Amino acid sequence: MGRLDEKVAVITGAGGGMGREAALLFTEEGAKVCAADLQLAVAEETVASCPEGSAFSFQVDVANEEQVAAMMRATADRFGGIDVLYNNAGISPDDDASVLDTSVEAWDRVQDVNTKGVFLCCKHGIPYLLERGGGSVINVASFVAILGAATSQISYSASKGAVLSMSRELAVQFAREGIRVNALCPGPVETPLLLNIFGDDPAALERRRIHWPTGRLARPREIVNGALFLASDESSYVNGATFLVDGGLTAAYVTPE
């Protein structure tokens, strides 16, 4: 038996990185999955790598309320309901930097996807979990919701702090209705998003590496293993958690040489 047998999950940002890994792992463990992404082609690539019949692709802009509502409705219509929300979609553009340099337009764009997107997925997804008598919501925050950085991405960091706070509030609100809400807080992960940021600036990557106790980036599957636990019934009493999967980054003061 799989750890997610008979569960239905909606995964945003499923076209690559942690979202794709989650779709692959969740379907391997028996779940039915809506693999949603802004780019339909990459979502379809994810579905093609999943067991046949276990997933379908959906094109969605998570900042668009009508599209998010349609995604939830399509998933419930196809698979009979929804049990798990893995709200993973997020952006970190180059023009999100210091508070002194970041434009209002850049700030708003990040907030629309990273904060409003999670809000909309919860707003339109949780009613389906209530219909099932409960379920699990996994909101992807970040270690930057816990730690500050001199190498600022001001809107991204603020958005992840908002996701963390939102997750706590929802966890308390819906606890007695069988819904668990947790904030998955990854450390730096080897994803296209991060590699794109540092691809042309290895010195910037090295500046950060000295703060990682493990000395390396996390692999997407290592983060998604945490999401699998939170999605499964094994975590039935885990609610409102700041679920850090960061290789000890937030525990560190001086790292090994």
Predicted regions, residues:
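Canonical Rossmann dinucleotide-binding motif of NAD(H)/NADP(H)-dependent dehydrogenases/reductases
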Residues: 3-34
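Short C-terminal tail/terminal secondary-structure segment
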Residues: 96, 228, 239-257
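The beta1-alpha1 cofactor-binding region of Rossmann-like NAD(H)/NADP(H)-dependent oxidoreductases
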Residues: 40-41, 60-70, 104, 221-222
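Alpha-helical segment proximal to the catalytic Tyr-Lys
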Residues: 127, 172-176, 236
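Residue(s) in the substrate-gating loop at a strand-loop-helix junction
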Residues: 142
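Active-site helix of classical SDR
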Residues: 122, 159, 167
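Substrate-binding pocket helix/loop in short-chain dehydrogenase/reductase
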Residues: 96-99, 103-108, 204, 208
